[in-house]
Amino acid sequence: MAIAGGADGVWKTELSDDGGYLEVTVGPCESDATKTCGKISSAFTNKGANPNYKNLGKLMVKDMKSDDGANYSGGTIWDPEKDKVYKSKMHLKGDILDVKGCVSIICSGQDWKRVR
């Protein structure tokens, strides 16, 4: 972890409309360890684990920068349900990661919960 107390770890997304969710492993980007990325590490339906989820291992959060380990910006987030990429910002509040995707000045977000 580059900054103590940063967003590194495993995060659970909010539930989708059908009750599923993803776990995203956040840490230094492979291409540039000074930036933060997040890969989809697990997927769950409303009935349990989904090991055949087609997007396992794909980057969801890419190239986020932080000077303080709590506020992240300058990167993107990929929405696998819509297959769209948005400018992104994140704010760490204890074990909650407020993740936002933005189009122009309009942002929409989720509160992800730290799993570990």
Located regions from the model:
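Short, exposed beta-strand-loop hairpins at the edges of beta-sheets
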Residues: 79-90, 95-109
